Amino acid sequence: MYLYTLILLFLASANVNAYANPGACSGNCWTHDPGLYQRKSDGKYFRFATGGGIHIASADSLEGPWTDDGYVLPSGSIIDLDGKTNLWAPDLHYHDGTYYLYYAVSSLGSQNSAIGVATSKTMEAGSWTDHGTTGIESTPSSPYNTIDANWIAVGGNQYVNFGSYWNNLFQVEMENGLKVKSGATPHQIAYNASGIHRQEAAFMFERNNYFYLTFSGGIALGYNDTWPAPGEEYFIAVCRSTSATGGFVDKNGVSCLNSGGSLLLSSHDFVYGPGGQGILQDSSKGFVLYYHYADTRIGKAVEDYQFGWNQLKWENDWPSV
């Protein structure tokens, strides 16, 4: 809605100088829709990115130097859909001794999409096994688009959040890390009613008995053609709930199902259009927000995107950068 846009523009202008700049990065700092995880055995960092069979980079610290290690699935996915050799939006988790990586098979503007999964014991290139589709799939008749997966466990239950544009963000219960639960029906957890519903990249995490739902909004791509109007570029927002399955509201109590969302990070200084975010619970730095952004000192094309990260600060159980 128009009011939603005005609120975000106001918040963006008010916070333009309030954010900390991204933490240092050296080596291979390119990324797009990053997935980030710290290996349990030795603390080594692995960063995954959209493109090809999912790019892998690794480093001994968040600051780098990051090395390019190849791909998760060099030949692409076994899911037979357009986009199977150009996989998107990796999401990582660790469960019972195994690392799981969710990825999306789709193409721009299409709802012919599926969420696939690969597993590894180490996260190293060459160690991944593709299991194909999780059963989370969409077609043009679906109310959602099954990309941008994000896993969370609550007690003995596992869930995957997903969605982009259309009716935005949904959640479905999983049988295990590989397959959706039989008979489970996705339910909506967030919706932006304005315009063409620019909302995607759900990432949920838990802290102090709250579940936080972060997501990206605004215009994600096309900066190499033109700059969007100020405030219309990618940004990161957050809502929270005492339940992982719904009831998310922003700082003002506005429901995430009714265009709610408190701004967490937007363009500032040399950082333009941050998004595609996730949260790492780092062994030494605590909760770390990671994302991609266009560095205005380098370029605005996807090929120029950079890896950004910031330690989160907390006030009244709300995160800030």
UniProtKB/Swiss-Prot annotation:
Enzyme Commission no: 3.2.1.99
Catalytic residues identified in the record: D33 (proton acceptor), E200 (proton donor)
Protein family per UniProt: Belongs to the glycosyl hydrolase 43 family.
UniProt subcellular location: Secreted
Pfam families: Glyco_hydro_43 (PF04616)
Domain of life: Eukaryota
Leader sequence residues: 1-18
The name this protein goes by in its record: Probable arabinan endo-1,5-alpha-L-arabinosidase C
Residues that carry a glycan: N192, N224
Pathway: Glycan metabolism; L-arabinan degradation
Coiled coil: none
Function: Endo-1,5-alpha-L-arabinanase involved in degradation of pectin. Its preferred substrate is linear 1,5-alpha-L-arabinan.
Source organism (scientific name): Aspergillus fumigatus (strain CBS 144.89 / FGSC A1163 / CEA10) (Neosartorya fumigata)
SUPFAM superfamilies: Arabinanase/levansucrase/invertase (SSF75005)
Site for Important for catalytic activity, responsible for pKa modulation of the active site Glu and correct orientation of both the proton donor and substrate, residues: D148
Reaction(s) the record says it catalyses: Endohydrolysis of (1->5)-alpha-arabinofuranosidic linkages in (1->5)-arabinans
Molecular-function GO term, any one: arabinan endo-1,5-alpha-L-arabinosidase activity
GO cellular component terms given for this protein: extracellular region
Gene Ontology BP terms: arabinan catabolic process; xylan catabolic process
Keywords annotated in UniProt: Carbohydrate metabolism, Glycoprotein, Glycosidase, Hydrolase, Polysaccharide degradation, Secreted, Signal, Xylan degradation
CDD domains: GH43_AnAbnA-like
